[in-house]
């Protein structure tokens, strides 16, 4: 489906993406994960034809994205990491506007929009102005807009950014539903645990390199296997759990009454820095230790 070979993106002497190779089969829900500046957004923008690579090839369904950009854009639905929503339009007008960009007839737009708004659970918001929607609703509307021309590949850059927990769950369920319908999906996030809950395959990026990619279970075991610690916390657990879950190199395995069991892909000094940061944020860490058998 999506094939990336020896992809580079240079800005002068700085390499934002370095020798990236990736294959995403049809029907996969693939997630790029990594810290800010890892190269996720740059890679996604190159896949979507929004910036040219310095070197390398991108093919979708065997079509070279660099040689046939117009054909490729018909195959891609893109949701950027900002809303790009016209707040002064009603939801129905917003869908009409984007449908017209693909030269769909009014009848086609109405039929497709009705189906898509039902899919993203916004059927009752058709005559509501976009600026009255919640952040989560706006994000789901962006997904509906990206699907209006029935693309074979849906690409989302940080789709859960800024969403509350309920909206994150709704987005996860929507993407999993789309995958069950046969869509191939590529998303990015800096939160590993988030991708682990929705993707069937992931790629870990760091400093422009794809350092690990494959089946979610295999990647998690390879990256985190054998690196397990327990963090003891006094008082409220939620801030500590949230902070650990948002770290790109940590997977929260379980949460007890006073202990958080995590897997990690960090050096000892990085663990110490993380614990110090937790304490600076007002979290009372009473200790941390390696689990037995590690």
Regions found by a protein language model. Give the residues of each.
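Conserved ABC ATPase "signature" region
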Residues: 96, 100, 107-125
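Catalytic Walker B motif of ABC-type/P-loop ATPase nucleotide-binding domains
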Residues: 154-157
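Conserved ABC transporter NBD signature motif
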Residues: 56-64, 71-72
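Conserved ABC ATPase signature
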Residues: 129-133
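Conserved catalytic motifs of ABC-family nucleotide-binding domains
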Residues: 150
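ABC transporter nucleotide-binding domain
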Residues: 172-263
